[in-house]
């Protein structure tokens, strides 16, 4: 798999986002923009990328994706710097306040929706505004008709495909991401833009503390592969869906969960 052009990654300071940045570089992208609210984590991503792939340009942008003004400014900066956006990985999201619906604080619900749903919507809105202006490129050398202006991959969750108890806000937000993904996959297909979603299950990140892993032991035992996903496995799936190898894949919600959703 070989990718070329400009990539944009949101949540680029987190474990999965950083893996996506490195994944795009590993597969050939030489101009990458990374968005995150945490400037320190974003700088860690920049340093890791520079060490591993010194020839790759990286544009770090600190932005709150729940703010339309900040998203619009961030996308404009990427286009001003690199001239286009060929791949967008909308990966940013926040955690899951536990609670039944009648127990969930409305402010907590609103915060989850503002980042996990509104944030993805805003990113797509301004990414698509740019992509529809771009010239179509032939992305699959074996398929002359595979012409694309861009490709978007949204990070949803296996909890967008099923529900876990006591996660009212988070479950709802990830189902909404899949609704947006499918809608835009249909609406923009004939404009040469594919929109897909990746649905990670339980991912082995620094945020998953050892105590949490022990609490998840019963769940992990239900995963046919009997282990957590690596951030790199999620990243490689995003890179695959982004590129021309997946030129006829559109509107999917692809689990990266070791078979958990089919058990």
Task: For the regions a language model picked out, list residue spans one by one.
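Substrate-binding pocket helix/loop in short-chain dehydrogenase/reductase
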Residues: 99-101, 108-110, 208, 219
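Active-site helix of classical SDR
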Residues: 124, 173, 181
